[in-house]
From Swiss-Prot:
PROSITE patterns from the UniProt entry: RIBOSOMAL_L31E (PS01144)
Source species, domain of life: Archaea
SUPFAM superfamilies the record matches: Ribosomal protein L31e
Gene Ontology molecular function terms on file: structural constituent of ribosome
InterPro entries, per the entry: Ribosomal_eL31, Ribosomal_eL31_CS, Ribosomal_eL31_dom_sf
One GO BP: cytoplasmic translation
UniProtKB keywords: Ribonucleoprotein, Ribosomal protein
UniProt-recorded name of the protein: Large ribosomal subunit protein eL31
Listed GO CC annotations: cytosolic large ribosomal subunit
Matching HAMAP family: Ribosomal_eL31
Amino acid sequence: MSEERKVVASREYVISLRRAYVVSRTKRAKYAVGLIRRFVARHLKVEPSAVKIGQKLNMELWSRGIEKPPRRVRVSVEKYSDGTALVELKE
């Protein structure tokens, strides 16, 4: 049986994605997802592979296509007791 996950920490961030515009146009949105994973992993002390991107955040990143992700996103992050983190778009 699996244990129930408990929220250990809950935070809000504004993550700048301007570094995604340094890479070639055809890789920007995918690179922006990686930027968010690395940012959250660094701030919450989890592995980048343990960071889950919410569906609404993913839709926002890809809304203008692969070539033009947003310059910044406001997110809410929850860290769970099992060492994972969930990143959702702040509304």
